[in-house]
């Protein structure tokens, strides 16, 4: 198996929710000499230093400061969250001899693939420990849940456009009636805490099926949450491998992109603005110096793109239709759902040439409305010259997505050059 793809799959396996993804990045950065900063403490920023700061345990910004002073930020933005089903408060529902869990939809999930596959629960618990309120990350590492389909004999419309009702059709089966009252006991045991100490929770279902590399030449990688952990992983690896000599290099991974980014840990928050300003102040510069730095800086907003589908080619633009493993996709939208313009696209294409990787173009069909992503949302807080890009993938927002091995390697390589 390709080494980079193997590392990506390990990263994804250990990151069933945004909380674990950020914890994995924290571990990788700490292992590579980065120092953690706290938002509620004073920062000491030095030339040659490597740092990271976390907000809500689900968003992270890591950065390096070159030995020789620089006032330019090179930023790659991605996101830590993926569509899922979130556990509601008081989740156990006992009906007809079964225990189900009450869930609600998080983000724009593709629902059908969630059926008839082993699932479990991960996220965080808020607990009282030694008279202190603290977070405990938790992964229930066993096949614990399943959302069973209704047999075709009882739903003749199943293959002809049946519309799923999340409140009725998507409730996962936890056990027989004898399992009543045991859900939080199971979660508490997995977290190493007492059930009675749980004060709150942010728990999500996750697909237990492991990722894999496949295809006639092992050219495809399939796994849960490729959107957008594939980009987050590539940016992280690029920052660790980069020389970091020419600019202040910033790896930014925000939460809640799939639900609009309008949280304190989302792209619409002040997290990036606060961090860049504090870096600038920590280096002894004025607020005007900070504004000058922003005018010189560049951001790559990295969120996966739709590859042309083998069975639905008509869903793609007739000309601009990205292929898997044919290059990083530069994303355009006339209505500014993406930040890419002629200038930022030209700069990115030159960066691709420097890195020795290919790029291609993604544009929606003119009769299909596209969604926005990190770039234009974060620009409402920090005005930066920005290009929107993505790695082409299939089955976006499915609990099991497919992308390209080569594209992952190319983005790691490009990120390393960008972070030179």
Regions found by a protein language model. Give the residues of each.
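N-terminal hydrophobic/helix-forming segments and targeting peptides
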Residues: 1-420
């Amino acid at each position: 198996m390709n080494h980079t793809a193997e590392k990506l799959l390990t990263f994804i396996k250990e990151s069933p929710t945004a909380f674990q993804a950020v914890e994995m990045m924290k571990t990788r950065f700490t292992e590579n000499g980065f120092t953690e900063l706290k938002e509620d403490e004073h920062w000491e920023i030095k030339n040659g230093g490597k740092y990271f700061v976390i907000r809500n345990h689900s968003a992270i910004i890591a950065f390096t400061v070159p030995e020789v002073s620089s006032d330019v930020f090179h930023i790659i933005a991605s996101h830590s969250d993926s569509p899922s089903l979130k556990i509601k408060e008081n989740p156990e529902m006992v009906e007809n001899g079964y225990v189900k869990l009450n869930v609600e939809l998080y983000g724009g999930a593709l629902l059908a693939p969630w059926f008839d596959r082993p699932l479990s629960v991960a996220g965080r618990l808020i607990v009282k420990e030694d008279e202190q309120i603290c977070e405990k990350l938790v992964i229930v590492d066993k096949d614990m849940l399943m959302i069973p389909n209704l047999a075709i004999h009882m739903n003749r419309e199943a293959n002809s456009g049946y519309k799923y009702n999340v409140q009725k059709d998507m409730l996962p089966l936890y056990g027989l009636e004898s399992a009543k009252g045991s859900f939080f006991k199971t979660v508490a045991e997995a977290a190493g805490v007492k059930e009675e100490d749980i004060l709150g929770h942010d728990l999500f279902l996750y697909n237990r099926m492991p990722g894999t590399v496949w295809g006639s030449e092992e050219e495809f990688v399939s796994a849960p949450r490729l959107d957008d952990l594939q980009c987050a992983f590539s940016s992280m690896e690029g920052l660790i491998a980069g020389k970091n000599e020419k600019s202040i290099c910033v790896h930014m991974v925000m939460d809640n992109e799939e639900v609009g980014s309008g949280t304190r840990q989302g792209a619409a928050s002040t997290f990036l603005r606060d961090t860049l300003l504090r870096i600038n102040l920590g280096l002894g510069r004025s607020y005007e110096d900070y504004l000058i730095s922003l005018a010189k800086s560049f951001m790559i907003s990295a969120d996966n793109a739709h590859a042309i589908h083998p069975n639905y080619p008509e869903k793609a633009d007739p000309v601009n239709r990205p292929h898997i493993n044919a290059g990083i996709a530069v994303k355009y939208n006339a209505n500014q759902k993406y930040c890419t313009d002629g200038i930022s696209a030209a700069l990115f294409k030159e960066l691709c040439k420097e890195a020795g990787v290919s790029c291609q173009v993604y544009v929606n069909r003119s009769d299909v409305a596209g969604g926005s992503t990190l770039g234009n949302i974060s620009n409402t807080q920090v005005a930066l010259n920005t290009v929107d890009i993505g790695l082409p993938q299939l089955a976006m927002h499915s609990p099991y997505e497919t992308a390209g091995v080569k594209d992952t390697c190319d983005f790691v390589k490009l990120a390393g050059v960008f972070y030179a």
